[in-house]
From Swiss-Prot:
The protein, known as: Uncharacterized oxidoreductase YKL071W
Alphabetical keyword list: Cytoplasm, NADP, Oxidoreductase
Pfam family, one: adh_short
GO molecular function ontology, one term from the record: oxidoreductase activity
Recorded family membership: Belongs to the short-chain dehydrogenases/reductases (SDR) family.
Species assigned in the record: Saccharomyces cerevisiae (strain ATCC 204508 / S288c)
Record's subcellular location: Cytoplasm
Binding site for NADP(+): I18, S37, K46, D66, Y164, K168, V197, T199
Length: 256
């Protein structure tokens, strides 16, 4: 097997939703190796579909990662290096997130703020700190964060998503900072809005807004597969001059 020409992806959060569909689509090409993380036991129902797919496609390798646990984050690089034929990571994709904060700012509990920040902003950055040396082993050096327009200041969405929006705004700031810090080493760091997606998490939000009689009739709702497919099309077009930018799933440039 010629492994030197293969593209290796590391996807955080590949067990379901957008992350699973990224794994599914990218692993369909035999020229790709997809390393993806799951949270919790492989036997859990939420991890079953990616575990089953990995049994069929030998270019999928699964590692354990809990973005809220220091020990788990600390072990992630070693877990990745144990995967078959590992030579380095070409493209890092942080996709895991939590979104269950539909409170007004003055009503949001401290635990909700901290959980969203830990999972959506701090966790992916701490994981990147650990796998950064593995990205240096390859010349591709692309880092993609699945963010959200909910974290945009200049394109503010007038919905009460408090802790979720704040956590994505923090992630977006990290993207901008990383883009200039890592540029001298040839990295391209980009944030992406995946659209309004009918994942379990997205559907929970949609149901909440409907229950509160909030008009979302103008929102284009897409499936996880549609989002992942569109994102991959944009991923493939990313050039070094796109470093530090924010793109929508349809390829249009967003604003921070």
């Amino acid at each position: 097997m010629n492994t030197s020409s293969r593209i290796t992806y590391f996807i955080i959060g590949g067990s379901r939703g957008i992350g699973f569909n990224l794994v599914k689509i990218l692993s369909a090409s035999t020229g790709n190796t997809v390393i993806t993380s799951i949270r919790g036991s492989p036997s859990l129902p939420k991890n079953k579909q990616v575990e089953d797919l990995a049994k069929i496609r030998k270019n999928i390798h699964i590692v354990q990662l809990d973005l809220t646990k220091d020990e788990s984050i600390g072990n992630i690089a070693d877990e990745i290096k144990k995967t078959p034929f590992f030579l380095g990571i070409d493209i890092f994709i942080a996709c895991s997130a939590v979104s269950d904060s539909y409170y007004k700012v003055l009503e949001t509990p401290k635990s909700v703020w901290l959980n969203h920040y830990s999972t959506n902003a701090l966790g992916p950055i701490l994981a990147l700190q650990k796998v950064y040396p593995l990205l240096l082993l390859k010349k591709t050096r692309k880092i993609f964060f699945i963010s959200s327009v909910a974290g945009s200041i200049n394109a503010f969405v007038p919905l009460s998503v408090s802790a979720y929006g704040q956590s994505k705004a923090a992630l977006n700031y990290a993207v901008k900072t990383l883009s200039f810090e890592l540029k001298p080493e040839g990295f391209t760091v980009v944030a992406f809005h995946p659209g309004m997606v009918s994942t379990d998490m997205g559907q929970y939000g949609l149901d909440h807004f409907k229950e509160k009689n909030i008009d979302i009739s103008g929102v284009n709702i897409i499936t996880p597969e549609e989002s992942a497919s569109a994102l991959i099309d944009v991923f493939r077009k990313i050039l070094p001059e796109d470093n530090g930018k924010f793109f929508n799933y349809d390829g249009s440039e967003g604003v921070f």
